[in-house]
Amino acid sequence: MSKLIVPQWPLPKGVAACSSTRIGGVSLPPYDSLNLGAHCGDNPDHVEENRKRLFAAGNLPSKPVWLEQVHGKDVLKLTGEPYASKRADASYSNTPGTVCAVMTADCLPVLFCNRAGTEVAAVHAGWRGLCAGVLEETVSCFADKPENILAWLGPAIGPRAFEVGAEVREAFMAVDAKASAAFIQHGDKYLADIYQLARQRLANVGVEQIFGGDRCTYTENETFFSYRRDKTTGRMASFIWLI
């Protein structure tokens, strides 16, 4: 049975969301077992079977629109029409039955919806995209006001495991000096709290209903894939859609 995480947040009627783990698939080590990424060296047949299992377990209404994630800040608006390019790190939809999805294996997945249950979005926020403003870009796609938007921070590398160089801290502080509170000195490096950085960025644009942000992909090795921990590994995915 594919093990899914159902976000704990006050979802409005008409919105559904879930996030995958590494449990319940058919892939062999080091992709064991519910690897959803077709780009990381796994057997394509295994990936296809894993996706089928996930879609069934999550009761997805259609195949997700998979993005070509590039650690940027572009948002793809899902219209149901053919896309000239899927190079983006977030997707937005106001169409029922269209599934927004992002893949991660340490980077932060963020799911959005508005209280009225008419708009949703999914974001892949690695530190580069987060620093560049992918969350702000996504919020700006919503017709609704930021105060009516809810955000869920999915499983990412935790604050005790995410070691970065001084240049990462400096990049965030160049945008917002308050970001310094999310970094703790660790030898000649820093430990970064990607959840705190995301909360700061969201609060800065008026999104204050923020949930999740309490898991660690790096330390919870039985449950999650982690690129930083294992290098060659699988990918989880987070999904949200209008019913």
Curated annotation (Swiss-Prot):
Gene Ontology terms for molecular function: adenosine deaminase activity; copper ion binding; oxidoreductase activity; S-methyl-5-thioadenosine phosphorylase activity
Record keywords, A-Z: Copper, Hydrolase, Metal-binding, Oxidoreductase, Transferase, Zinc
CDD domains, alphabetized: YfiH
A Pfam entry, by short name: Cu-oxidase_4
InterPro entries attached to this UniProt entry: Cu_polyphenol_OxRdtase, Cu_polyphenol_OxRdtase_sf, Cytotoxic_necrot_fac-like_cat
Highest taxon, organism lineage: Bacteria
Spans traversing the lipid bilayer: none
Keyword Calcium carried by entry: no
Enzyme Commission number(s) from the entry: 2.4.2.1, 3.5.4.4, 2.4.2.28
Substrates-to-products reaction catalysed: adenosine + phosphate = alpha-D-ribose 1-phosphate + adenine; S-methyl-5'-thioadenosine + phosphate = 5-(methylsulfanyl)-alpha-D-ribose 1-phosphate + adenine; inosine + phosphate = alpha-D-ribose 1-phosphate + hypoxanthine; adenosine + H2O + H(+) = inosine + NH4(+)
Record-listed Zn(2+) binding positions: 71, 107, 124
CC cofactor: Zn(2+)
NCBIfam families in the record: peptidoglycan editing factor PgeF, PRK10723.1
Family the UniProt entry places it in: Belongs to the purine nucleoside phosphorylase YfiH/LACC1 family.
Protein role: Purine nucleoside enzyme that catalyzes the phosphorolysis of adenosine and inosine nucleosides, yielding D-ribose 1-phosphate and the respective free bases, adenine and hypoxanthine. Also catalyzes the phosphorolysis of S-methyl-5'-thioadenosine into adenine and S-methyl-5-thio-alpha-D-ribose 1-phosphate. Also has adenosine deaminase activity.
Protein name: Purine nucleoside phosphorylase YfiH
Organism field: Shigella flexneri
Designated gene of the protein: yfiH
